A protein has these predicted regions:
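Vicinal oxygen chelate
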Residues: 5-13, 53-71, 78-104
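Short hydrophobic/aromatic-rich motifs at helix boundaries and adjacent loops
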Residues: 26-28, 72-75
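Histidine- and/or cysteine-centered catalytic micro-motif in compact active-site loops
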Residues: 35-36, 70-72
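Core segments of cupin and vicinal oxygen chelate
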Residues: 11-62, 100, 107
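Short loop/beta submotifs within extracellular cysteine-rich repeat domains
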Residues: 38, 75-76
């Protein structure tokens, strides 16, 4: 049996802004967007009374990213803030035209770092 990654989930503070970045800057397509709640979501998240809006985005290569904005639970900034902190530290993307993507990142208000 071989496994493959279905999607990567990323919690965001502002889903609308995150969607604009992933679609307009990186070219992902929104496949599914929904408000979720209920016992099955509570069990999946390991929390009680969860209310979350999710959006699944598909890249041109068929890989998926899921963005999650929680409405029921405040952000808990437990991440230590450096590369050795436990948790997600980065996601690597491959693009066809790095210069064009960098220009879109800057136009979106992002900063490029070397």
């Amino acid at each position: 049996m071989r496994a493959r990654i279905r999607h990567t989930g990323i919690v965001v503070v502002d889903l609308e802004e995150a969607l604009r970045f992933w679609t307009e800057v990186l070219g992902f397509e929104i496949k599914v967007r929904m408000d979720e709640a209920g016992p099955h979501i509570d069990a999946m998240m390991g929390l009680e009374d969860v209310r979350v809006t999710t959006a699944k985005l598909k890249a041109p290569d068929e890989s998926m990213v899921e963005l999650l904005q929680f409405h029921s639970h405040p952000d808990v900034a437990a991440w230590g803030g450096d590369a050795s902190s436990t948790g997600l530290t980065h996601i690597a993307l491959t693009v066809d035209d790095i210069d064009a993507v960098c220009a879109r990142v800057e136009a979106f208000g992002g900063a490029l770092v070397a």
